[in-house]
Amino acid sequence: MTNKIEKDIIKNLDTSKNYVVALSGGVDSAVLATVVAQQTPNLRSVFVRHNQKHSDKLEEMANRIADNLKINHKALDSNLKENSSETKMRDARYEILYDELNDDEILLTGHTLSDKVETFFINLLRGTRVRGLKSIPKMTPRLRRPLLEISKDNLINYAKENNIEYLDDCLLYTSDAADE
C-alpha cells in the first residue's frame, strides 16, 4: 500500500518545480505534504483561516505538520464570517492561495477520489451538462491534485502505517454534536 500511494502522488510531479501545498491539518493534506516533502526540497505550505468554529485546532495541526516536515509555512486570513457556506469558503480559499503563489510555483491540494465522486454527483443533481460532469480536473497549469485517484480510507491507512499526525475532521463535527 505504501509504495502505491507514494507512486500515485509523485507520478505527475516534476521534483525540480516549486510547490505550495494547501495544508488544512486533515489527513489528505498531511499525507500529501509528507510524501512531497520526501521527494523535493522545493515545498512550502499555506493554511487558510476561515474563522470557523475549529479553525484554531486545524491551524495548530497544520503548523505542527509543517514543523515536523521542516518546511516553510504560512497562515493567511480569509476574512469570512463564522458559519460561512462551503462554497464561499472554497472560493475564498482558492483566491487566497492563488494570490499567495509566486510565478514559479504550483499549488497542490488534497482532493481525493471521494471528493471527485461527490463533485460528480453534485453536478449531476444540479443538471450540469456533460462537460460539467467531468468533475474535478487533476491538473491545470498552476494546480495539481495528486490524490484524486486515492480513496480517503487508503490515505488514513497510509497515515497510520507511517505515523503521520493529522486532525480527524469527523472528530471535530462529532464533538460539535456532543456540545449541543
Task: Identify the function of each model-found stretch.
Residues 2-23, 27-175:
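Core alpha/beta nucleotide-donor-binding catalytic domains of modification enzymes
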Residues 176-180:
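A short, hydrophobic C-terminal helix/tail in secreted or cell-surface proteins
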